[in-house]
A protein has these predicted regions:
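Alpha-helical transmembrane segments in inner-membrane proteins
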Residues: 1-359
Length: 359
């Protein structure tokens, strides 16, 4: 028995180190790139603002100095900076959720939308728009609140179905999430058809395709707490995530309560997904693609993978949002459309490269 346990330990250590690269250099590069992207996101637009003035406005606001007269302060502090920060937070959160869900169900092609949570959030948001539930405009706090309630209700339903018969098996969890998610998606489509006017329909479709245009400092509050908290929680359980990828027996041999860890992972990823979808709508491919890219750089060890996924996800969504705002003069592109157009070819390339290296 002792020999078997020692072999399990060695197997886990080897899996932790396989294909790994120290996370420090890539993380430093991503951090610098993220800072540059945030600067560009605030500086670029219909009215260009010099980068030096951008950070001058931010510094004056943070230090409590009186803002200078003019439009630059309004554009930077009230419009573009909250949006850039929201893009970074949502991108980081999607990167974390994607990494965690892929470990939860032991499937590298899984993402949080597989569990049905985003479908529930979308139904809540569409109901708020079409049926007039909740206070606030189409991109106000009423919409976000309704989306989060929908996500939590779906979480409870998927949890109840997945727990039937005892245990918390990945296959049962995925099947429950897919089935419930498809049902909610059909109901959402029905509500879209019931939209009373063209403006309502446009608001619904634009939100369903992902949008950061409703960013405000008030809207930032919840994701600003939820994303760092989730990162710290997941980082503390990184070895458990590594063990889950090697199978339940191996994880149990390492002293991990597999069922409890899966329950906790499902809860955390569901709540975080609900928060993200509530403030940004459904943004595709980020949670699926980011972990794949980061694994190519630092390997599969979640101690390195989680922080790098958060940084890369933040950078990716900030850059995508710049494209969405500036690509067309007459209107803004939905964020989810751009992530799908960029993400699908990139993911196919990465998968082809990985499968080619295996063969």
């Amino acid at each position: 028995m002792i020999v078997a346990f020692t072999r399990v330990r060695r197997k886990a250590a080897a899996a932790d180190e396989r294909g790994s690269l120290p996370a420090g250099p890539p993380a430093a590069v991503l951090a610098v790139a993220l800072l540059a992207a945030l600067t560009a996101a605030v500086a670029w637009g219909s009215t260009s603002i010099p980068p030096g003035e951008v950070w001058s406005v931010v510094w004056r606001r943070l230090s409590g100095e009186a803002p200078r007269p003019g439009t630059d302060d309004l554009i930077v502090w009230q419009l573009r900076f909250p949006r850039a920060l929201l893009a970074a937070l949502v991108g980081a959160g999607l990167g974390l959720v994607g990494t965690a869900v892929q470990a939860l169900v032991r499937n590298p092609l899984a993402d949080p939308y597989l569990l049905g949570i985003s479908n529930g959030a979308s139904l809540g948001a569409v109901a708020a728009i079409v049926l007039g539930l909740g206070a606030g405009g189409a991109l106000g706090l009423g919409l976000s609140g309704a989306a989060f309630v929908g996500a939590l209700a779906t979480f409870a339903l998927v949890w109840a179905v997945a727990r039937r018969g005892g245990g918390f098996a990945p296959l049962r969890l995925v099947l429950a999430g897919v089935a419930i998610g498809q049902f909610l998606s059909g109901f959402t489509s029905y509500l879209v058809l019931q939209a009373g006017d063209e403006q309502q329909t446009h608001s619904v479709l634009f939100w369903l395709m992902g949008s950061l245009s409703g960013a405000t400092w008030e809207l930032l509050a919840v994701p600003a707490v939820a994303v760092p908290t989730a990162l710290l929680w997941l980082q503390a359980r990184a070895r458990g995530l590594n063990a889950l990828l090697m199978g339940d027996e191996t994880a149990a041999g390492l002293g991990i309560d597999v069922t409890r860890l899966r329950r906790e992972l499902f809860t955390v990823t569901s709540v975080l997904t609900g928060v993200l979808v509530a403030v940004s709508g459904a943004i595709a491919f980020v949670a699926l693609m980011v972990p794949h890219v980061c694994r190519l750089v630092v390997g599969g060890d979640h101690r390195r993978l989680l922080p790098l996924s958060a940084l890369f996800g933040a950078l990716l969504l900030v850059v995508v949002d710049i494209v969405c705002r500036t690509a067309m003069d007459t209107q803004e592109l939905p964020v989810g459309v751009v992530t799908s157009l960029l993400g699908a070819p990139a993911l196919l390339y990465l998968l082809d490269r990985r499968l080619g290296s295996v063969s």
